[in-house]
Amino acid sequence: MPFEQPLTAAPTSATPFRTSRPLRTGDVAPDNRLRFDGIARYLQDIASDNADAAGFGATDPVWILRRTVIDVHTPAAFPDRLHLSRWYSAYSTRWSNMRVQLTSDKGARIETEGFWINLNSDTGMPTRISDSTLELLATTTDESRLKWKAWLDQAAPAADGLPDAAFPLRSTDLDPLGHVNNAAYLHAVEEHVTARPDLLAAPHRLVIEYRAPITAGEHLALRRRDDDESSTMWFVVNGESRATARMARL
């Protein structure tokens, strides 16, 4: 199953982009665990830092996430210092898989991968990645025929089968495109995963896929289904599932 496939290893023939920073109290839960939304912010920050350092922030400035995979092998906990490595694990002419590994001074290990789509800043549609950025992507992978395949394609269950939980949006949840920010989706995930300490206690994988943006003024509801091995959440607006998240043991 796609959900269970392993992430690619770090390249041996090239050096990933690296940075480090302290684990901050604003990103941790009451038990000092680095929250999922905190991980999302670190991933966004290193993406921006990487774009600035490599120069493709000027040639390919607008990217959106279609999927994020977060594998928590050993969680990070405050206080600690995080070390982040970012490299390109596959690409095509309009999108790329970006791997980020988070380790720490105290032994944390979190492996992530994001499916990023390059957008035309005028039309908002997927567009061809510039030649210079394609050359950069090719420095850490030989996989140049990346195709999109959903990992979470299960439709949201009927509302009468599972009750919806309202999740009011705030102005601070929006990004420069007017969409709900990636980290804000994981605020909602955090609201529910604390009910599954059995999953959090073991190495676990969280996958979130975005189908359509959620914008200001829309009424977001969360629909959740649990079983012994996993927890799945649908982000529902007017009966339409805009995103799906699933957490399970690794």
What are these regions (language model features)?
Residues 165-249:
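Acidic/His-leaning functional-site neighborhoods
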Residues 2-66, 113-115, 119-204:
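Hot-dog-fold acyl-thioester-processing enzymes
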Residues 2-7, 12-14, 69-153, 210-217, ...:
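HotDog/MaoC-like acyl-thioester-processing domains
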